[in-house]
Amino acid sequence: MQPPSQDWASLLPAAWSEARQILRKKCGSRTFESWLKSLMLADFDSQKKIIRLACPSEFMANWISSHLSDELLLAWRTVWPGIAEVKVSVRNPESQPLLLDVTEIELPLGDQPRPLPKKPAKKKQSVPATPKSTSPEKKAEGEDQNQFEERYNFDNFVVGKANDLAYRAACTFAEGGKLDFNPLFLYGGTGLGKTHLMHAVGIEYLKRHPNSTALYMSAEKFMYDFVASMRAKDTHSFKARLRSADLLMIDDVQFIAGKDSTQEEFFHTMNEVITAGRRLVISADRSPQDLERIESRILSRLSWGLVADVNPADFELRLNIILKKLEAMPQVSMPEDIVFFLAKRICTNVRELEGALNRVVAYATLSNRPINMDFVTETLADLLRTTQQRVTVEDIQKRVCDHYHLKLADMSSKRRDRVIARPRQVAMYLSKQLTSRSLPEIGQRFGGRDHTTVIHAIRQIEKLRITDEDVDSDVRLLMRQFEG
């Protein structure tokens, strides 16, 4: 099969992004999160106009093909009328997804993704429709008000030590009062809640200021719209649309790295918004000083405001996230040990944790099976293999020894003096929290100790985390290193 031409390849990511938005609206958030969110763009046959998508398991591939094939094809054809067929198959773990670098190119003529027709904004409960008593330019901006997803609000955002600063900053920014900082720069890894906070800012800001306008877009869409406006020789409309917003939010700004003309426009847009006293929220996957191939003047401007990091969720935060999600599912009966198991084992990011929970609930509902440990380990086999490979008892021992300045042999030695015994207990505790090893297996890796010794160590650390701030701080720091 011939690979797609550069023109086709350049358009596919944006087309898939638009199709995903259509699918979310058409199928509903729950169906999208459970079945469609994990789909990846695997291949494209430019001759036969066939899109191939990949998912994690055969069960998912069969279910999607049986129940959602029409929706998939309709979504793609809405964005790209020439598509003939959409196929879903199991992802090959040894192959890479179709990674496409969207560069600043002119869009090809002819059969290509067409822009979706603009529709009047529909009023949502949490987001006002087009602002009242505004200028014509403001009314045009109102078309973008419906971009905020209601479920991404402050009430649904679970707060913990990992995201407390970012949450408080976002709340302050959304109030709309006098600002001591502008822009607000949120950074952190994938799936930790940056986009959730940005949507929450938009929803809350418009709720408090119904006559104001807010605009959220990804940096990818910023570039795509900018290139399209240059091709249409109508950059004025593009600039006016962004710079007239009272609140402008650009997500994943690292996407414009190395794209000179887009960075030029981004800088002037950012400068205009801040100078005019309007609000600007930017997000990225790393801090400003760690962003590469971004102009220094942009990085300097970003650093003027408040820079807040969103860290990986610790065990307690993950546990609270699951409990919060289950509150909205009163029909679901999930045993406590399963809740703790999910919080311990799915620690990559919040998005993966929520996806795992949705998958368990959806599969249990469809198969009419009880949610027990056998069912969960079977349903999440792919995710659990990944997390098991990430952290081993040996990894934990090495990290604990580095933290307490001990030798690795101390983890297996018979020495019982406190300077060694306490870190060894911490390592046993972390081994139980972060791996799937049984108590006897953990004991074997600590010099052949009995499982009762491991139980004693776990209980000791659990007690000390309540009464000793230093121990609790050490444990939190070590867990965060593994979960980041």
Swiss-Prot record:
Region annotation Domain II: where it falls in the sequence: 83-146
InterPro entries with a match to the protein in the record: AAA+_ATPase (IPR003593), Chromosome_initiator_DnaA (IPR001957), Chromosome_initiator_DnaA-like (IPR020591), Chromosome_initiator_DnaA_CS (IPR018312), DnaA_C (IPR013159), DnaA_dom (IPR013317), DnaA_N_dom (IPR024633), DnaA_N_sf (IPR038454)
Region of interest called Domain III, AAA+ region, as start-end residue ranges on this chain: 147-364
Region (Domain I, interacts with DnaA modulators): 1-83
Bias (Basic and acidic residues) ranges: 135-146
Stretches for region Disordered: 110-146
Transmembrane segments: none
Keyword ATP-binding: yes
Basic residues bias locations: 116-125
Record note on quaternary structure: Oligomerizes as a right-handed, spiral filament on DNA at oriC.
Family classification: Belongs to the DnaA family.
Protein name per UniProt: Chromosomal replication initiator protein DnaA
